[in-house]
Amino acid sequence: MTDSSTDPSLSFSDAITHARGGNDLSAEQTGALIDAMLQGAANEEEVGQLLLALREKGEAVSELVGAARAMRKHMTRIDHEHDVLLDTCGTGGSGSGTFNISTAVAILASACGVAVAKHGNRRATSKTGSADVLECLGVKIESEPDQVSRRLNDIGICFCFAAKLHPAMRHVVSVRRKLAVPTLFNLLGPLCNPAGATHQLLGTAAPETQQKIAAALAELDTQRSYVLHAQDGQDEVSLDGETSCIEVASGTQQNHTWTPADFGLTPVHQNALAAADPPESAEIIRNLFGGSPGSHRDTVLAGCAAALRLVGRVSSLTEGVEIAAEAIDSKAAQDKLKQLAE
């Protein structure tokens, strides 16, 4: 793929032609086009054609960076007092049908003393989105921004509901629904946390997506992030084989590969993690925070261990597992969930 032009701006029709020709748009060009979309100043037919052209070509890193910068300008920001802030929002789209692992990891990490702003939405391609399961757990997902900010400062965790905090997305809802396929916007959620997360444990559904997201984060303002893709296809830390992790820090990238042994845990096949719907996912999370042993617990311990290592709370994954297990066994995780639902 090549950069389409040195021209800092392109019309929608020109951008569509360039993308259909296999040319990547620059960050500046993409940003201007996304900005027009989010202001409601773009023709819906051209928006759809451009999104499809980018999808068919394959979204470039420059396009992700430009789109993320534009989307961040339009989001409702959540103010807070934390210097270190974690998000566990991933791209979704793995089709694995598991319970909401990243949501459980977010709550457990908060119980371990890490400030967390969990960004998420209702289900799109999965059986249960983070907003759906949190609603089943009694969390008020549509709180006003000042309430979200207060919750983050007071108890160290909040839920940033994408549908509420990205109001400009209303301008592209119709065309995305008509297209009915994943587009550039499906990759932007993890890059646009309304609270400005400094650290991200970010799962991706495909190796090529993992590489693009990591490269985009290196150009954006992440302090340190782990971009994940598991050998079994999960967009999480997996205990079913190897998990690839690209560590992004200070604009540089470093590759890691983790196995269950690195966590001191036994393998878990992803079939053991299935959840049919949000209520079942919520019940799994309640039970594991209640102390139930087994595959669900071990998988969340592994994810939390990675999060704790990411923010510098521990120096090893096995130490992270020990601290996360203590947070469950002491009922700190259960208490944190109750606080979040109050």
UniProtKB/Swiss-Prot annotation:
SUPFAM superfamilies: Nucleoside phosphorylase/phosphoribosyltransferase catalytic domain, Nucleoside phosphorylase/phosphoribosyltransferase N-terminal domain. Binds 2 magnesium ions per monomer. One of its GO terms (cellular component) is cytosol. Mg(2+) 1 binds at residues 102, 236. Its cofactor is Mg(2+). Keywords: Amino-acid biosynthesis, Aromatic amino acid biosynthesis, Glycosyltransferase, Magnesium, Metal-binding, Transferase, Tryptophan biosynthesis. Anthranilate 1 binds at residues 90, 121. Its EC number is 2.4.2.18. Mg(2+) 2 binds at residues 235-236. 5-phospho-alpha-D-ribose 1-diphosphate binds at residues 90, 93-94, 98, 100-103, 118-126, 130. It catalyses: N-(5-phospho-beta-D-ribosyl)anthranilate + diphosphate = 5-phospho-alpha-D-ribose 1-diphosphate + anthranilate. Pfam families: Glycos_trans_3N (PF02885), Glycos_transf_3 (PF00591). GO terms for molecular function: anthranilate phosphoribosyltransferase activity; magnesium ion binding. InterPro entries: Anthranilate_Pribosyl_Tfrase (IPR005940), Glycosyl_Trfase_fam3 (IPR000312), Glycosyl_Trfase_fam3_N_dom (IPR017459), Glycosyl_Trfase_fam3_N_dom_sf (IPR036320), Nuc_phospho_transferase (IPR035902). GO terms for biological process: L-tryptophan biosynthetic process. Pathway: Amino-acid biosynthesis; L-tryptophan biosynthesis; L-tryptophan from chorismate: step 2/5. Anthranilate 2 binds at residue 176. Homodimer. Belongs to the anthranilate phosphoribosyltransferase family. Catalyzes the transfer of the phosphoribosyl group of 5-phosphorylribose-1-pyrophosphate (PRPP) to anthranilate to yield N-(5'-phosphoribosyl)-anthranilate (PRA). This is Anthranilate phosphoribosyltransferase. It comes from Rhodopirellula baltica (strain DSM 10527 / NCIMB 13988 / SH1).
